[in-house]
Design a protein with these regions (language model features):
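Polytopic alpha-helical membrane-helix bundles and their juxtamembrane interface segments
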Residues: 1-237
């Protein structure tokens, strides 16, 4: 683990970079590679480092899983943002895979952060696993049923439309599981922070999807920083 001063630098870096990004975005309204590719994704990557070295996360696999989840999201963002600025395109499947990997990794990390007594953890482990299975099953079924009708309202291939449904469904699952853990752990403060981060991230996702559906989304909008704020709060939990 890092010493106190190095960790303090790592921990403060995401927020400092976010503030710089917001200020530059206000000054420069037009998208630029430095602000929206390099700086934007640097916030997410430093948030991943902060989560990995966090002394609050005593469970090693929880740190690794949460950090990897944020790294994969940052990779997905980097791939898609790169394509917006340069002619050398990354295959869209790369960003889709990276974004999709965010959800199971974050769910696994959330489960591993349980701070309950080991005996109590064993008692509720089966309940959480059942909840995850049911949640993913119902979500997958709903996404499949919605796919046909969504094709008439969203542009793009069947895969892109399906992913546009799966991503917010994944957000909802994360919120639901976090709320369940809050109830099981009687309002653990870390889970409140996790819920806040997931809620901010989810709200940004839904807002992005809504704007995209009515063709009003503007690339590199200041509202995109909601994703970064959510990830920073998650890394602090």
């Amino acid at each position: 683990m890092l010493g106190y001063r190095p960790y303090l630098i790592v921990r403060c870096s995401p927020l400092a970079l976010l503030i710089i990004h917001l200020l530059l975005r206000i000054v420069h309204s037009q998208p630029t590679a430095i602000i929206d590719l390099l700086l934007f994704n640097s916030v997410a990557l430093t948030a991943a480092l902060s989560a990995y070295f966090s002394p609050l996360l005593k469970e090693r696999f929880a740190r690794i899983s949460i950090a990897l989840a944020i790294v994969f999201w940052a990779l997905g963002s980097t791939f898609s943002t790169w394509d917006a600025f340069f002619s050398d395109y990354f295959p869209s499947a790369l960003s889709d895979i990276a974004y999709t990997a965010f959800y199971p990794l974050l769910l696994f990390g959330l489960f591993r952060t349980l701070t309950l007594h080991p005996m109590k953890r064993n008692e509720i482990k089966g309940e959480i696993i059942d909840t995850l299975i049911i949640g993913f099953g119902v979500s997958g079924l709903c996404a499949g049923l919605a796919l046909k009708s969504a094709m008439t309202n969203f542009e793009g291939s069947a895969l892109s439309v399906f992913l546009s449904i799966v991503f917010p469904v994944g957000d909802v699952i994360l919120v639901a599981v976090t709320i369940s853990l809050l109830a099981l752990q009687r309002g653990n403060l870390r889970n409140f922070l996790f819920l806040l981060g997931i809620t901010i991230f989810t709200a940004t996702d839904i807002y992005f999807l809504w704007q995209s559906s009515i063709s009003t989304y503007a690339f590199a909008a200041i509202t995109d920083d909601g994703w970064l704020i959510g990830l920073i709060v998650i890394s602090e939990s």
